[in-house]
Amino acid sequence: MISASRMEESASSSSLSDAAAPPPGAALQSIRSSCDRCRFHKLKCNVPAAGHGGPVPCERCTRAKVPCVFGRRRRANRPSEDKKRPAAPTRRATMPSPSPTPASTSAAHGGGDSATTGSADPPPPPPSTMDAALQRTPASHSDTGPAATYDGRSWETLMTGGLGDSPDILPGQHNSAGNGWEWFHQGFGLDDTSMFDADTLDPAIIWSPPTPQHIPTAALALATTELDMTTAPPATSGGTANMMRSSNTNTNSNSNSSSCWAPVQQLLPLIADMQQRLKMLEQGPWQGGDFPQSLDDYPVGAVLHLSREFGSIAGQVLSRAIAAGMVTGGGVPPVVRNHATDGGREFIVTNNPQKHLGSESSSSSSSSISNSSSNNEAGGDDGGVDTATALLVLGGYMWLMRIYGAALGHFQVHLSGLSGASESDGCGRGASRSGPNASPALRLGELPSTGTAPDLGRIHTALGMLQGALAEVEGQLGRGGAVARNLVVALLTRQEAVSRGVGGGGGGGGGGGGGGGGGVGGGGGGGGGPGGSSEHSGGSSDVDDCEGLGGKVQSVKELLREKMGF
Protein backbone atom coordinates (compact mmCIF):
# COMPACT_ATOMS: atom_id res chain seq x y z
CA MET A 1 0.00 0.00 0.00
CA ILE A 2 2.75 2.36 0.91
CA SER A 3 4.76 1.57 -2.17
CA ALA A 4 1.73 1.93 -4.38
CA SER A 5 0.91 5.36 -2.99
CA ARG A 6 4.49 6.50 -3.46
CA MET A 7 4.43 5.36 -7.04
CA GLU A 8 1.23 7.34 -7.69
CA GLU A 9 2.75 10.48 -6.14
CA SER A 10 5.88 10.19 -8.25
CA ALA A 11 3.77 9.67 -11.34
CA SER A 12 1.65 12.74 -10.61
CA SER A 13 4.71 14.90 -9.89
CA SER A 14 6.31 13.79 -13.12
CA SER A 15 3.15 14.65 -14.99
CA LEU A 16 3.04 18.11 -13.41
CA SER A 17 6.66 18.73 -14.26
CA ASP A 18 5.97 17.64 -17.79
CA ALA A 19 3.05 20.08 -17.91
CA ALA A 20 5.08 22.94 -16.45
CA ALA A 21 8.16 22.43 -18.53
CA PRO A 22 7.85 23.17 -22.23
CA PRO A 23 8.39 20.23 -24.46
CA PRO A 24 11.39 20.22 -26.74
CA GLY A 25 10.82 22.19 -29.91
CA ALA A 26 7.85 24.14 -28.48
CA ALA A 27 7.75 27.96 -28.59
CA LEU A 28 6.94 29.55 -25.26
CA GLN A 29 4.43 32.35 -25.82
CA SER A 30 3.70 35.30 -23.56
CA ILE A 31 0.60 35.34 -21.38
CA ARG A 32 -1.01 37.95 -23.58
CA SER A 33 -0.32 35.84 -26.72
CA SER A 34 -1.55 32.60 -25.13
CA CYS A 35 -4.90 30.97 -25.71
CA ASP A 36 -7.97 31.88 -23.76
CA ARG A 37 -7.71 28.93 -21.36
CA CYS A 38 -4.00 29.49 -20.56
CA ARG A 39 -4.48 33.26 -20.33
CA PHE A 40 -7.31 32.72 -17.85
CA HIS A 41 -5.01 30.60 -15.66
CA LYS A 42 -2.16 33.06 -16.31
CA LEU A 43 -0.04 30.46 -17.99
CA LYS A 44 2.03 30.56 -21.12
CA CYS A 45 1.13 28.40 -24.09
CA ASN A 46 3.46 25.81 -25.47
CA VAL A 47 2.80 25.59 -29.19
CA PRO A 48 4.66 22.84 -31.01
CA ALA A 49 7.19 24.08 -33.53
CA ALA A 50 5.88 21.73 -36.18
CA GLY A 51 2.46 23.29 -36.16
CA HIS A 52 3.15 26.53 -38.00
CA GLY A 53 1.25 25.41 -41.04
CA GLY A 54 -2.20 25.79 -39.44
CA PRO A 55 -4.11 26.23 -36.21
CA VAL A 56 -2.61 23.74 -33.78
CA PRO A 57 -3.81 23.55 -30.17
CA CYS A 58 -1.33 24.11 -27.41
CA GLU A 59 0.07 21.29 -25.32
CA ARG A 60 -2.04 22.00 -22.24
CA CYS A 61 -5.30 22.09 -24.19
CA THR A 62 -4.28 18.87 -25.97
CA ARG A 63 -3.60 17.05 -22.72
CA ALA A 64 -6.79 18.41 -21.20
CA LYS A 65 -8.69 17.40 -24.37
CA VAL A 66 -10.43 20.77 -24.59
CA PRO A 67 -10.65 23.07 -27.59
CA CYS A 68 -7.78 25.55 -27.79
CA VAL A 69 -9.22 28.93 -28.75
CA PHE A 70 -7.14 32.04 -29.42
CA GLY A 71 -9.75 34.74 -28.89
CA ARG A 72 -9.56 38.45 -29.56
CA ARG A 73 -7.19 40.10 -27.13
CA ARG A 74 -7.99 43.26 -25.21
CA ARG A 75 -5.94 46.27 -26.09
CA ALA A 76 -3.15 46.95 -23.65
CA ASN A 77 -3.46 49.88 -21.23
CA ARG A 78 0.15 50.84 -21.66
CA PRO A 79 0.81 54.04 -23.64
CA SER A 80 2.33 53.75 -27.03
CA GLU A 81 5.97 54.26 -27.73
CA ASP A 82 5.39 57.85 -28.89
CA LYS A 83 3.60 58.75 -25.66
CA LYS A 84 6.18 57.14 -23.44
CA ARG A 85 9.05 59.21 -24.81
CA PRO A 86 8.07 62.61 -23.27
CA ALA A 87 8.02 61.03 -19.81
CA ALA A 88 11.78 60.57 -20.04
CA PRO A 89 14.10 63.41 -18.86
CA THR A 90 15.02 66.19 -21.22
CA ARG A 91 18.53 64.84 -21.62
CA ARG A 92 17.21 61.52 -22.95
CA ALA A 93 18.21 62.54 -26.45
CA THR A 94 21.85 61.93 -25.52
CA MET A 95 21.13 58.39 -24.25
CA PRO A 96 20.92 55.39 -26.60
CA SER A 97 17.38 54.20 -27.19
CA PRO A 98 16.67 50.67 -25.83
CA SER A 99 16.24 47.86 -28.34
CA PRO A 100 12.76 46.34 -28.59
CA THR A 101 12.22 43.08 -26.71
CA PRO A 102 10.92 39.93 -28.42
CA ALA A 103 7.83 39.95 -26.19
CA SER A 104 6.87 43.49 -27.19
CA THR A 105 7.57 42.69 -30.84
CA SER A 106 5.39 39.61 -30.77
CA ALA A 107 2.72 41.53 -28.82
CA ALA A 108 2.67 44.32 -31.37
CA HIS A 109 2.43 41.96 -34.36
CA GLY A 110 0.57 39.02 -32.83
CA GLY A 111 -2.69 38.03 -34.53
CA GLY A 112 -5.61 35.82 -33.73
CA ASP A 113 -3.89 32.64 -35.00
CA SER A 114 -0.96 30.71 -33.63
CA ALA A 115 0.96 30.89 -36.89
CA THR A 116 1.31 34.65 -36.61
CA THR A 117 2.35 34.52 -32.96
CA GLY A 118 4.96 31.94 -33.60
CA SER A 119 6.63 33.72 -36.46
CA ALA A 120 10.05 35.33 -36.26
CA ASP A 121 10.55 38.79 -34.74
CA PRO A 122 9.80 41.57 -37.22
CA PRO A 123 12.37 44.33 -37.87
CA PRO A 124 12.28 47.33 -35.48
CA PRO A 125 10.07 50.24 -36.50
CA PRO A 126 11.71 53.18 -38.30
CA PRO A 127 12.75 56.14 -36.13
CA SER A 128 9.90 58.54 -35.56
CA THR A 129 9.95 62.32 -35.77
CA MET A 130 10.11 62.47 -31.98
CA ASP A 131 13.72 61.27 -31.95
CA ALA A 132 14.68 63.91 -34.46
CA ALA A 133 12.89 66.59 -32.47
CA LEU A 134 14.63 65.58 -29.26
CA GLN A 135 18.03 65.58 -30.93
CA ARG A 136 17.54 69.08 -32.32
CA THR A 137 18.56 72.16 -30.39
CA PRO A 138 15.85 74.60 -29.15
CA ALA A 139 16.88 77.05 -31.86
CA SER A 140 16.17 74.53 -34.64
CA HIS A 141 12.93 73.21 -33.13
CA SER A 142 10.08 73.19 -35.60
CA ASP A 143 6.33 73.14 -35.06
CA THR A 144 5.87 69.96 -37.14
CA GLY A 145 6.65 67.67 -34.19
CA PRO A 146 4.18 66.53 -31.53
CA ALA A 147 2.66 69.12 -29.22
CA ALA A 148 3.87 67.38 -26.03
CA THR A 149 7.58 67.81 -26.74
CA TYR A 150 8.47 69.28 -23.32
CA ASP A 151 7.06 67.75 -20.17
CA GLY A 152 6.46 69.21 -16.71
CA ARG A 153 9.82 68.06 -15.46
CA SER A 154 11.62 70.44 -17.79
CA TRP A 155 9.68 73.35 -16.23
CA GLU A 156 10.77 72.27 -12.75
CA THR A 157 14.34 72.10 -13.94
CA LEU A 158 14.08 75.60 -15.39
CA MET A 159 12.37 77.28 -12.41
CA THR A 160 14.19 75.61 -9.49
CA GLY A 161 17.15 73.45 -10.27
CA GLY A 162 18.26 75.41 -13.31
CA LEU A 163 18.65 78.67 -11.40
CA GLY A 164 21.89 77.59 -9.79
CA ASP A 165 23.29 76.63 -13.20
CA SER A 166 22.17 79.81 -14.95
CA PRO A 167 25.05 81.59 -16.68
CA ASP A 168 23.49 84.95 -15.75
CA ILE A 169 24.43 84.51 -12.07
CA LEU A 170 27.86 85.88 -11.39
CA PRO A 171 30.09 84.60 -8.57
CA GLY A 172 29.18 86.07 -5.21
CA GLN A 173 25.55 86.81 -6.10
CA HIS A 174 24.04 83.89 -4.15
CA ASN A 175 22.61 84.73 -0.76
CA SER A 176 23.02 82.71 2.39
CA ALA A 177 20.14 80.38 1.47
CA GLY A 178 21.73 79.59 -1.89
CA ASN A 179 18.47 79.75 -3.82
CA GLY A 180 19.91 81.94 -6.55
CA TRP A 181 16.90 84.22 -7.06
CA GLU A 182 18.99 87.41 -6.98
CA TRP A 183 19.62 87.30 -10.73
CA PHE A 184 15.88 87.64 -11.34
CA HIS A 185 15.91 91.16 -9.83
CA GLN A 186 19.36 92.19 -10.97
CA GLY A 187 19.01 91.11 -14.55
CA PHE A 188 15.52 92.43 -15.29
CA GLY A 189 14.67 95.77 -13.50
CA LEU A 190 11.25 94.66 -12.40
CA ASP A 191 11.39 96.77 -9.24
CA ASP A 192 13.37 99.99 -9.27
CA THR A 193 12.94 100.48 -5.54
CA SER A 194 14.79 97.25 -4.71
CA MET A 195 17.61 98.22 -7.03
CA PHE A 196 18.13 101.60 -5.40
CA ASP A 197 17.25 100.77 -1.80
CA ALA A 198 19.54 97.75 -1.62
CA ASP A 199 22.61 99.45 -3.06
CA THR A 200 24.71 102.11 -1.35
CA LEU A 201 25.24 104.71 -4.03
CA ASP A 202 27.35 107.83 -4.04
CA PRO A 203 25.12 110.88 -3.28
CA ALA A 204 27.19 112.95 -5.70
CA ILE A 205 26.19 110.58 -8.53
CA ILE A 206 22.47 110.18 -7.87
CA TRP A 207 21.82 113.75 -6.73
CA SER A 208 23.52 116.92 -7.89
CA PRO A 209 22.87 120.51 -6.79
CA PRO A 210 20.31 122.38 -8.88
CA THR A 211 21.39 125.00 -11.34
CA PRO A 212 20.62 128.68 -10.70
CA GLN A 213 17.71 128.42 -13.15
CA HIS A 214 16.02 126.14 -10.65
CA ILE A 215 16.40 128.54 -7.70
CA PRO A 216 14.04 131.49 -8.32
CA THR A 217 13.85 132.66 -4.70
CA ALA A 218 15.99 132.69 -1.59
CA ALA A 219 13.53 130.45 0.22
CA LEU A 220 14.05 127.70 -2.32
CA ALA A 221 17.80 128.02 -2.04
CA LEU A 222 17.66 127.79 1.74
CA ALA A 223 15.26 124.86 1.51
CA THR A 224 17.80 122.85 -0.46
CA THR A 225 20.02 122.69 2.61
CA GLU A 226 17.33 120.75 4.46
CA LEU A 227 17.28 118.00 1.86
CA ASP A 228 18.85 114.74 2.88
CA MET A 229 21.52 114.25 0.24
CA THR A 230 21.90 110.56 1.15
CA THR A 231 18.32 109.59 0.30
CA ALA A 232 17.48 107.72 -2.78
CA PRO A 233 15.90 109.32 -5.83
CA PRO A 234 12.16 108.85 -6.55
CA ALA A 235 11.03 105.22 -6.69
CA THR A 236 9.52 105.49 -10.14
CA SER A 237 11.34 104.88 -13.36
CA GLY A 238 10.31 108.32 -14.58
CA GLY A 239 11.84 109.92 -11.50
CA THR A 240 15.05 108.03 -12.09
CA ALA A 241 15.16 109.19 -15.68
CA ASN A 242 14.59 112.77 -14.56
CA MET A 243 17.45 112.46 -12.12
CA MET A 244 19.75 111.20 -14.84
CA ARG A 245 18.68 113.98 -17.19
CA SER A 246 19.22 116.54 -14.43
CA SER A 247 22.70 115.16 -13.81
CA ASN A 248 23.52 115.38 -17.50
CA THR A 249 22.19 118.92 -17.64
CA ASN A 250 24.35 119.97 -14.73
CA THR A 251 27.37 118.33 -16.29
CA ASN A 252 26.84 120.09 -19.61
CA SER A 253 26.02 123.47 -18.06
CA ASN A 254 28.25 126.43 -18.76
CA SER A 255 30.94 127.68 -16.45
CA ASN A 256 28.84 130.64 -15.40
CA SER A 257 26.11 128.48 -13.89
CA SER A 258 28.56 126.25 -12.03
CA SER A 259 30.51 129.21 -10.65
CA CYS A 260 27.25 130.84 -9.56
CA TRP A 261 26.26 127.72 -7.65
CA ALA A 262 29.67 127.28 -5.96
CA PRO A 263 29.36 130.44 -3.77
CA VAL A 264 25.91 129.28 -2.67
CA GLN A 265 27.37 125.96 -1.57
CA GLN A 266 29.97 127.85 0.46
CA LEU A 267 27.61 130.50 1.81
CA LEU A 268 25.09 128.09 3.30
CA PRO A 269 27.47 126.38 5.79
CA LEU A 270 29.26 129.67 6.47
CA ILE A 271 26.01 131.38 7.49
CA ALA A 272 25.20 128.39 9.69
CA ASP A 273 28.59 128.82 11.40
CA MET A 274 27.83 132.51 11.92
CA GLN A 275 24.56 131.66 13.62
CA GLN A 276 26.25 129.15 15.92
CA ARG A 277 29.05 131.60 16.77
CA LEU A 278 26.57 134.37 17.58
CA LYS A 279 24.59 132.02 19.81
CA MET A 280 27.77 131.03 21.65
CA LEU A 281 28.77 134.66 22.17
CA GLU A 282 25.33 135.66 23.42
CA GLN A 283 25.06 132.68 25.79
CA GLY A 284 28.70 132.63 26.90
CA PRO A 285 30.15 133.70 30.24
CA TRP A 286 30.81 137.20 28.86
CA GLN A 287 27.09 138.07 28.77
CA GLY A 288 25.06 139.38 31.69
CA GLY A 289 25.92 140.13 35.29
CA ASP A 290 28.41 137.27 35.70
CA PHE A 291 30.92 139.07 33.54
CA PRO A 292 34.45 137.97 34.42
CA GLN A 293 37.27 140.33 35.17
CA SER A 294 39.35 138.94 32.30
CA LEU A 295 38.68 138.36 28.61
CA ASP A 296 41.68 136.13 27.98
CA ASP A 297 39.48 133.31 26.62
CA TYR A 298 37.46 135.50 24.29
CA PRO A 299 37.35 133.90 20.74
CA VAL A 300 38.70 136.79 18.70
CA GLY A 301 40.24 134.48 16.10
CA ALA A 302 36.87 132.89 15.28
CA VAL A 303 35.32 136.28 14.50
CA LEU A 304 38.27 137.23 12.30
CA HIS A 305 38.09 133.88 10.49
CA LEU A 306 34.39 134.33 9.69
CA SER A 307 35.09 137.82 8.37
CA ARG A 308 37.85 136.55 6.13
CA GLU A 309 35.80 133.68 4.69
CA PHE A 310 32.69 135.79 4.12
CA GLY A 311 34.63 138.61 2.48
CA SER A 312 36.26 136.19 0.04
CA ILE A 313 32.99 134.53 -1.03
CA ALA A 314 30.97 137.74 -1.18
CA GLY A 315 33.69 139.35 -3.23
CA GLN A 316 33.37 136.65 -5.90
CA VAL A 317 29.60 137.07 -6.09
CA LEU A 318 29.61 140.85 -6.32
CA SER A 319 32.52 140.90 -8.76
CA ARG A 320 30.45 138.71 -11.05
CA ALA A 321 27.45 141.02 -10.67
CA ILE A 322 29.55 144.08 -11.44
CA ALA A 323 31.09 142.37 -14.48
CA ALA A 324 27.59 141.54 -15.76
CA GLY A 325 26.50 145.16 -15.36
CA MET A 326 23.87 144.33 -12.75
CA VAL A 327 25.31 146.83 -10.24
CA THR A 328 28.16 149.31 -10.19
CA GLY A 329 31.05 149.31 -7.82
CA GLY A 330 29.60 152.17 -5.79
CA GLY A 331 26.36 150.32 -5.16
CA VAL A 332 24.18 152.09 -7.75
CA PRO A 333 22.19 149.62 -9.86
CA PRO A 334 22.27 150.44 -13.57
CA VAL A 335 19.24 150.50 -15.82
CA VAL A 336 18.51 146.96 -16.92
CA ARG A 337 16.51 146.76 -20.13
CA ASN A 338 14.58 143.78 -21.46
CA HIS A 339 13.11 144.13 -24.94
CA ALA A 340 10.03 142.36 -26.23
CA THR A 341 8.11 142.99 -29.40
CA ASP A 342 4.43 142.46 -30.09
CA GLY A 343 3.78 143.10 -33.73
CA GLY A 344 5.01 146.64 -34.42
CA ARG A 345 5.19 147.73 -30.78
CA GLU A 346 8.25 147.52 -28.53
CA PHE A 347 8.22 147.46 -24.77
CA ILE A 348 11.14 148.25 -22.49
CA VAL A 349 11.27 147.02 -18.91
CA THR A 350 13.77 148.72 -16.61
CA ASN A 351 14.63 148.09 -13.02
CA ASN A 352 12.52 151.11 -12.12
CA PRO A 353 8.82 150.23 -12.62
CA GLN A 354 7.87 153.93 -12.77
CA LYS A 355 9.74 154.35 -16.06
CA HIS A 356 7.93 151.76 -18.18
CA LEU A 357 7.61 152.70 -21.82
CA GLY A 358 4.83 151.58 -24.12
CA SER A 359 1.28 150.52 -23.60
CA GLU A 360 -0.16 147.44 -21.99
CA SER A 361 1.07 144.26 -23.55
CA SER A 362 -0.86 141.24 -24.58
CA SER A 363 -0.52 137.89 -22.90
CA SER A 364 2.02 136.69 -25.44
CA SER A 365 4.30 139.68 -24.97
CA SER A 366 4.05 139.42 -21.19
CA SER A 367 5.01 135.77 -21.37
CA SER A 368 7.97 136.60 -23.57
CA ILE A 369 9.15 139.31 -21.19
CA SER A 370 8.70 137.02 -18.21
CA ASN A 371 10.79 134.28 -19.78
CA SER A 372 13.51 136.72 -20.75
CA SER A 373 13.62 138.27 -17.31
CA SER A 374 13.63 134.89 -15.61
CA ASN A 375 16.66 133.84 -17.62
CA ASN A 376 18.47 137.05 -16.77
CA GLU A 377 17.54 136.75 -13.10
CA ALA A 378 18.77 133.20 -12.84
CA GLY A 379 22.12 134.21 -14.20
CA GLY A 380 22.09 131.67 -17.00
CA ASP A 381 22.89 133.37 -20.27
CA ASP A 382 24.02 136.82 -19.16
CA GLY A 383 26.40 135.42 -16.52
CA GLY A 384 24.84 137.48 -13.70
CA VAL A 385 23.83 136.66 -10.16
CA ASP A 386 20.45 135.25 -9.21
CA THR A 387 18.27 136.70 -6.49
CA ALA A 388 18.85 133.81 -4.10
CA THR A 389 22.62 134.29 -4.09
CA ALA A 390 22.31 138.04 -3.62
CA LEU A 391 19.96 137.53 -0.67
CA LEU A 392 22.37 135.05 0.88
CA VAL A 393 25.22 137.56 0.61
CA LEU A 394 23.13 140.29 2.20
CA GLY A 395 21.93 137.95 4.94
CA GLY A 396 25.48 136.84 5.69
CA TYR A 397 26.57 140.46 6.01
CA MET A 398 23.78 141.13 8.52
CA TRP A 399 24.79 138.08 10.60
CA LEU A 400 28.40 139.28 10.57
CA MET A 401 27.31 142.71 11.79
CA ARG A 402 25.46 141.09 14.67
CA ILE A 403 28.59 139.15 15.64
CA TYR A 404 30.66 142.33 15.58
CA GLY A 405 28.01 144.09 17.64
CA ALA A 406 28.08 141.35 20.28
CA ALA A 407 31.89 141.43 20.49
CA LEU A 408 32.05 145.22 20.76
CA GLY A 409 29.30 145.14 23.39
CA HIS A 410 31.35 142.74 25.48
CA PHE A 411 34.41 144.99 25.18
CA GLN A 412 32.33 148.00 26.17
CA VAL A 413 30.90 146.30 29.26
CA HIS A 414 34.33 145.05 30.30
CA LEU A 415 35.95 148.46 29.94
CA SER A 416 33.11 150.10 31.82
CA GLY A 417 33.69 147.72 34.73
CA LEU A 418 37.36 148.62 35.10
CA SER A 419 38.03 151.13 37.89
CA GLY A 420 40.22 154.18 37.40
CA ALA A 421 42.65 155.12 34.68
CA SER A 422 45.97 153.45 34.43
CA GLU A 423 49.10 154.89 33.00
CA SER A 424 50.44 153.38 29.88
CA ASP A 425 53.49 153.97 27.76
CA GLY A 426 51.78 153.66 24.43
CA CYS A 427 50.53 150.12 24.76
CA GLY A 428 48.67 148.94 21.73
CA ARG A 429 50.01 151.63 19.43
CA GLY A 430 51.17 150.19 16.20
CA ALA A 431 49.31 146.98 16.96
CA SER A 432 49.09 144.29 14.35
CA ARG A 433 46.40 144.92 11.77
CA SER A 434 46.70 141.50 10.17
CA GLY A 435 43.31 140.45 11.45
CA PRO A 436 42.22 138.31 8.48
CA ASN A 437 45.41 136.22 8.76
CA ALA A 438 44.81 135.31 12.41
CA SER A 439 44.17 131.71 13.43
CA PRO A 440 40.53 130.70 14.13
CA ALA A 441 41.61 129.43 17.57
CA LEU A 442 43.18 132.75 18.56
CA ARG A 443 42.12 134.01 22.00
CA LEU A 444 42.23 137.54 23.33
CA GLY A 445 44.79 136.60 25.97
CA GLU A 446 47.23 135.49 23.25
CA LEU A 447 47.46 138.95 21.67
CA PRO A 448 50.66 140.92 22.32
CA SER A 449 50.51 143.78 24.80
CA THR A 450 53.00 146.12 26.49
CA GLY A 451 52.76 148.55 29.38
CA THR A 452 51.29 148.41 32.83
CA ALA A 453 47.70 147.59 31.66
CA PRO A 454 47.87 144.40 29.54
CA ASP A 455 44.10 143.99 29.37
CA LEU A 456 43.64 147.41 27.85
CA GLY A 457 46.43 146.79 25.39
CA ARG A 458 44.96 143.49 24.22
CA ILE A 459 41.50 145.01 23.78
CA HIS A 460 43.06 147.87 21.83
CA THR A 461 44.91 145.38 19.62
CA ALA A 462 41.78 143.26 19.10
CA LEU A 463 39.77 146.35 18.19
CA GLY A 464 42.31 147.30 15.55
CA MET A 465 42.25 143.77 14.06
CA LEU A 466 38.45 143.74 13.96
CA GLN A 467 38.41 147.13 12.26
CA GLY A 468 40.84 145.93 9.62
CA ALA A 469 38.82 142.77 8.90
CA LEU A 470 35.57 144.71 8.66
CA ALA A 471 37.19 147.26 6.37
CA GLU A 472 38.12 144.48 3.94
CA VAL A 473 34.56 143.13 3.96
CA GLU A 474 33.10 146.56 3.29
CA GLY A 475 35.63 147.00 0.52
CA GLN A 476 33.85 144.14 -1.25
CA LEU A 477 30.23 144.91 -0.30
CA GLY A 478 30.43 148.68 -0.05
CA ARG A 479 30.11 150.84 3.02
CA GLY A 480 27.30 149.42 5.07
CA GLY A 481 26.79 146.68 2.45
CA ALA A 482 25.48 149.20 -0.10
CA VAL A 483 26.51 147.14 -3.13
CA ALA A 484 24.84 143.96 -1.91
CA ARG A 485 21.76 145.84 -0.71
CA ASN A 486 21.23 147.70 -3.97
CA LEU A 487 21.81 144.52 -5.97
CA VAL A 488 19.03 142.80 -4.06
CA VAL A 489 16.73 145.80 -4.49
CA ALA A 490 17.39 145.88 -8.23
CA LEU A 491 16.68 142.17 -8.65
CA LEU A 492 13.51 142.25 -6.56
CA THR A 493 12.27 145.38 -8.33
CA ARG A 494 12.79 143.84 -11.73
CA GLN A 495 11.08 140.64 -10.65
CA GLU A 496 8.12 142.59 -9.29
CA ALA A 497 7.86 144.62 -12.50
CA VAL A 498 7.84 141.51 -14.64
CA SER A 499 5.26 139.78 -12.44
CA ARG A 500 2.92 142.77 -12.75
CA GLY A 501 3.42 143.08 -16.49
CA VAL A 502 4.62 145.90 -18.69
CA GLY A 503 2.74 149.14 -17.96
CA GLY A 504 1.02 147.57 -14.99
CA GLY A 505 1.63 150.35 -12.55
CA GLY A 506 3.85 151.46 -9.78
CA GLY A 507 6.75 149.78 -8.12
CA GLY A 508 9.19 150.44 -5.37
CA GLY A 509 12.01 152.86 -5.44
CA GLY A 510 15.56 151.65 -5.68
CA GLY A 511 17.82 151.48 -2.69
CA GLY A 512 19.49 154.80 -2.17
CA GLY A 513 22.73 155.55 -0.46
CA GLY A 514 22.45 156.14 3.23
CA GLY A 515 24.23 158.31 5.72
CA GLY A 516 27.41 157.10 7.24
CA GLY A 517 27.97 156.13 10.83
CA GLY A 518 30.85 156.84 13.09
CA GLY A 519 33.97 154.74 13.02
CA VAL A 520 33.99 151.55 11.06
CA GLY A 521 30.36 150.64 11.05
CA GLY A 522 28.82 153.64 9.30
CA GLY A 523 26.50 152.32 6.62
CA GLY A 524 24.31 153.44 3.79
CA GLY A 525 20.63 153.98 4.02
CA GLY A 526 18.05 151.52 2.80
CA GLY A 527 15.57 151.79 0.03
CA GLY A 528 11.95 150.93 -0.28
CA GLY A 529 10.90 147.45 -1.21
CA PRO A 530 8.89 146.41 -4.27
CA GLY A 531 5.55 148.04 -4.63
CA GLY A 532 6.55 151.40 -3.21
CA SER A 533 6.34 150.34 0.45
CA SER A 534 9.29 150.72 2.75
CA GLU A 535 10.44 147.44 4.29
CA HIS A 536 11.92 147.93 7.73
CA SER A 537 13.42 144.46 7.54
CA GLY A 538 15.46 145.49 4.52
CA GLY A 539 17.50 148.64 4.13
CA SER A 540 16.25 150.48 7.23
CA SER A 541 17.35 147.68 9.52
CA ASP A 542 20.72 147.70 7.79
CA VAL A 543 21.12 151.39 8.58
CA ASP A 544 20.12 150.86 12.19
CA ASP A 545 22.54 147.98 12.61
CA CYS A 546 25.40 149.83 10.97
CA GLU A 547 24.79 153.04 12.90
CA GLY A 548 24.54 151.05 16.12
CA LEU A 549 27.78 149.26 15.33
CA GLY A 550 29.50 152.55 14.58
CA GLY A 551 28.28 153.95 17.87
CA LYS A 552 29.68 150.96 19.73
CA VAL A 553 33.04 151.41 18.05
CA GLN A 554 33.18 155.05 19.09
CA SER A 555 32.16 154.15 22.63
CA VAL A 556 34.88 151.50 22.94
CA LYS A 557 37.48 153.94 21.61
CA GLU A 558 36.46 156.61 24.09
CA LEU A 559 36.62 154.14 26.96
CA LEU A 560 40.08 153.02 25.87
CA ARG A 561 41.30 156.61 25.75
CA GLU A 562 39.82 157.24 29.17
CA LYS A 563 41.27 154.12 30.77
CA MET A 564 44.64 154.49 29.10
CA GLY A 565 44.96 158.17 30.08
CA PHE A 566 44.90 159.72 26.63
Swiss-Prot record:
Which GO terms of the molecular function aspect are on file? DNA binding; DNA-binding transcription factor activity, RNA polymerase II-specific; zinc ion binding
InterPro entries from the xrefs?
Answer: Zn2-C6_fun-type_DNA-bd_sf, Zn2Cys6_DnaBD
Composition bias, Low complexity? 1-30, 89-108, 359-378
Task: Provide the alphabetized UniProt keywords.
Answer: DNA-binding, Metal-binding, Nucleus, Transcription, Transcription regulation, Zinc
Q: Which sequence positions fall in the DNA-binding region?
A: 35-68
Superkingdom, taxonomy of origin: Eukaryota
Q: Where is this region: Disordered?
A: 1-31, 72-174, 346-382, 422-453, 500-551
Task: Provide GO CC annotations from the record.
Answer: nucleus
Under the heading Pfam families, the entry gives: Zn_clus
Broad class of the protein's primary localization: nucleus
Location within or outside the cell: Nucleus
Give the Gly residues compositional bias ranges: 501-532
Provide the function of this protein: Transcription factor that regulates the expression of the gene cluster that mediates the biosynthesis of the tetramic acids Sch210971 and Sch210972, potential anti-HIV fungal natural product that contain a decalin core.
Protein name in the entry:
Transcription factor tasR
Species of the source: Hapsidospora irregularis
Organism placement in taxonomy: Eukaryota, Fungi, Dikarya, Ascomycota, Pezizomycotina
Give the gene symbol: tasR
